[in-house]
Amino acid sequence: MPLMPKRTKHRKMQKGQFAGLSKGANFVHFGEYGIQVLERGWITNQQIEACRVAINRFFQRRGKVWIRIFPDKPITKKPAEVRMGKGKGAVDHWVAVVRPGRILFEVANVPKDMAQSALRRAAAKLGLKTRFVERVEQV
């Protein structure tokens, strides 16, 4: 089942702005290791699911995975070969807006090299530059 909100206040949304850095979720909070995005962009619900499957298959029921993003922005699309105008198209898919510094996935209870390999496989499915990060204790 695809990731999407159960209910929304409005069916359709405007494009919005990408400016600035991530306002929160900049540190590994739940797990021991994570991947942090280095550029701004959209990540679709299908990409998030593909990453989750890739990580879980690599771990083979070991470890724990946290998904730190959620696709809450609807993207609309008009059908093929339809003239311009006549209103906004129907909702096609959902995306999560990410800005630089955002932690996307976190993992725990696995060795560092295994976590790095799994998160590298997940990052390959995103189309954005990412880096591997470790948990830093906050003072």
Swiss-Prot record:
Keywords: Ribonucleoprotein, Ribosomal protein, RNA-binding, rRNA-binding, tRNA-binding. This is Large ribosomal subunit protein uL16. Part of the 50S ribosomal subunit. The keyword Thylakoid does not apply. It comes from the Bacteria. It holds the Pfam family Ribosomal_L16. Signal peptide: none annotated. It comes from Protochlamydia amoebophila (strain UWE25). SUPFAM superfamilies: Ribosomal protein L16p/L10e. One of its GO terms (cellular component) is cytosolic large ribosomal subunit. The keyword Ligase does not apply. GO terms for molecular function: rRNA binding; structural constituent of ribosome; tRNA binding.
